[in-house]
Amino acid sequence: MLEAKFEEASLFKRIIDGFKDCVQLVNFQCKEDGIIAQAVDDSRVLLVSLEIGVEAFQEYRCDHPVTLGMDLTSLSKILRCGNNTDTLTLIADNTPDSIILLFEDTKKDRIAEYSLKLMDIDADFLKIEELQYDSTLSLPSSEFSKIVRDLSQLSDSINIMITKETIKFVADGDIGSGSVIIKPFVDMEHPETSIKLEMDQPVDLTFGAKYLLDIIKGSSLSDRVGIRLSSEAPALFQFDLKSGFLQFFLAPKFNDEE
């Protein structure tokens, strides 16, 4: 039996909104220590990995491991039926063919119950090895989102170049070109605005703008985004939750793709 209760439905809504435009069919694996999910987009360029730890829930019980295959488009429709401030409980038995979503507004004594049919999704769960990265940076997710949105107006590709002292984003398209340069700094009074950079090797990589536009939708989950880059591995973009994370592994574009 699974019973996973969020104190506010808005958290689960934001989690799903953070990656529902990247992938459609997802297996959620529910275990004693929380819920994990993983999916690859149709082009096999982007891998999404989600972990929601027990501490993220107001109440959590999972007596037996269970996999819930869901269509995120359908799930999102049901999530829109609940208010952000409602509590949300996910309920499923040990061999479910559907999942119950229970929204409760304790102030109004209102209870809304919805059932979503589950799917048998044929997808392997990949073991993600710990990778070595050439450069690691952390910056406000709002700033990264603005950079991506602005530069995507000019080109369908965005280049990220990192040196010891600067982080440069470049777009070069048919209508023109643009660049944004930011530098690492630490604000002791407002640490959430700091930009941190650890560089072992310079990085010069290009990514599809449409994928970056999908990735920045995870910004509603966290004030900051962590980015790890390497010429030998997919880039990692990570938004941390109170307990867990939402990760995007994105393969760079090569010269013959640009």
Swiss-Prot record:
Annotation: DNA-binding region: 61-80
Molecular function terms, GO-annotated: DNA binding; DNA polymerase processivity factor activity; identical protein binding
Claim: DNA repair is one of the keywords in the record: yes
Gene3D superfamilies membership: DNA Polymerase III, subunit A, domain 2 (3.10.150.10)
GO BP terms: error-free translesion synthesis; establishment of mitotic sister chromatid cohesion; lagging strand elongation; leading strand elongation; maintenance of DNA trinucleotide repeats; meiotic mismatch repair; mismatch repair; mitotic cell cycle
UniProt modification remark: Sumoylated on Lys-164, and to a lesser extent on Lys-127 by the UBC9/SIZ1 complex during S-phase; which impairs ubiquitination and function in DNA repair. Monoubiquitinated on Lys-164 by the UBC2/RAD18 complex upon DNA damage, and then polyubiquitinated through 'Lys-63'-linkage by UBC13/MMS2. Ubiquitination is required for UBC2-mediated DNA repair.
Any one annotated GO CC term: replication fork
Domain of life: Eukaryota
CDD domains found in the cross-reference section: PCNA
Subunit and partners: Homotrimer. Interacts with RAD30. Interacts with MCM10. Interacts with UBP10.
Protein name listed in UniProt: Proliferating cell nuclear antigen
Organism, scientific name: Saccharomyces cerevisiae (strain ATCC 204508 / S288c) (Baker's yeast)
